[in-house]
Amino acid sequence: MSRRYFGTDGIRGRANGLITPELALKVGQAAGLVFQRGDHRHRVVIGKDTRLSGYMIENAMVAGFTSVGMDVLLVGPMPTPAVAMLTKSMRADLGVMISASHNMFEDNGIKLFGPLGFKLSDDVEKQIELLLDESLDKKLAASASLGRARRIDGVHDRYIEFAKRTLPRDLSLDGLRVVVDCANGAAYKVVPEALWELGADVISIGVEPDGFNINKECGSTAPEALCRKVREMRADIGIALDGDADRVIMVDERGHVVDGDQLLAVIAQSWKEDGRLAKPGVVATVMSNLGLERFLAAEGIDLVRTSVGDRYVLEQMMKGGYNVGGEASGHIILSDYNTTGDGFVAALQVLAVVQKLRRPVSEVCHRFDPLPQILKNVRYRNGRPLDDAGVQSAIHAGETRLNGHGRLLIRASGTEPVIRVMGEGEDRIMVEEVVDVIVDALGSASAAAA
């Protein structure tokens, strides 16, 4: 069965376009019906980021869940990993995060978590999709069985304490000047507070959300402001989260970006030395740089690759018994602590290494020289540009040219109408030329289909 609503990370699209109040209400009803298992009183935790449309979607989902008899616990703006953690901690049947992650404010989305805090399997999402296309009028709760909604206080402190407990009790961040960019998103309160409680000298940017400025020239997808601020304030390190704080990148004292691949290298090497790696392996995606794979191999650590998407990384981690995984984009999953990517907890593990080694971040966090990698996105409106004969010819020619010297990865995004073209190889000029030819072919195919 093809999926109409769910992509690789829940349901996502333009607010009041795809993501309407009607859809949000129906998702609440459908998910509520699927997760009403057993005879106990059922409840759902709902969190959100700071987008203007979050109010609209939140209220619609409350109506949907309560109409099928589920109680709703509202936690307000909170990081996605916090919602996953709270779902399990509060013994809820279901968790919801209203967010479009790193997208701009015009978009929004709905992420769902099961009672143990894990994202839903494909099979469960299909069950919900089937109900979305049905009339649910005859499945609504009786008047006396409707759900209630209440706002929960103190959830920020719960997540702060949870994050702090991932570090040794005797470890302090005293003496470390940290600039943190919260992307004007869900972490704008909790992360600066947690860093301060751990003893860091904290400088915060991206902590003034207005409903419109989430991810706007800030956060993990736009680290330029953080790089400047780190240099300006002579900070030791910078931390950039995205709008829902499930991904992180970092910046060294020179203002140079440290991506997810480098963070995986730091954590994996440190955890192996400390005997904390469950297995001598790390899970990453096909997008991770070959330099990471070579570095880990030299450390006696295997790199297991998956399709793009943190859900696939987690699935492989669970299947293979690994406890460290992630993506170059900054989704870092440490399954000893959480059930999904947690940007802040990952950052704390890196800060712990920095404090332990007492060396500059530029020495600690740049563990390998990445191979030149070019990534370009081609947006399209209609059709299937990857099936175009001209595009296929360009891809074949590129693969032939890079044979033995690099690799190509061309894929459609699972969350937006974009084709991602990635080339990697030892000769940067050759890689750029190959990628540009494919991008031009995709652009022509997209224009022809419009």
UniProtKB/Swiss-Prot annotation:
Origin: domain of life: Bacteria
The residues the entry assigns to the signal sequence are none
Keywords in UniProt for this one?
A: Isomerase, Magnesium, Metal-binding, Phosphoprotein
Question: InterPro entries from the entry?
Answer: A-D-PHexomutase_a/b/a-I, A-D-PHexomutase_a/b/a-I/II/III, A-D-PHexomutase_a/b/a-II, A-D-PHexomutase_a/b/a-III, A-D-PHexomutase_C, A-D-PHexomutase_C_sf, Alpha-D-phosphohexomutase_SF, GlmM_bact
Q: Which residues form the active site?
A: S101
Q: Which GO terms describe its biological process?
A: carbohydrate metabolic process; peptidoglycan biosynthetic process; UDP-N-acetylglucosamine biosynthetic process
Give me the Gene Ontology terms describing cellular component: cytosol
Name the family: Belongs to the phosphohexose mutase family.
Question: Which NCBIfam families is this protein grouped with?
Answer: glmM, PRK10887.1
Tell me which HAMAP family the record gives: GlmM_B
| Name assigned to this protein | Phosphoglucosamine mutase
- List the taxonomic lineage: Bacteria, Pseudomonadati, Pseudomonadota, Alphaproteobacteria, Hyphomicrobiales
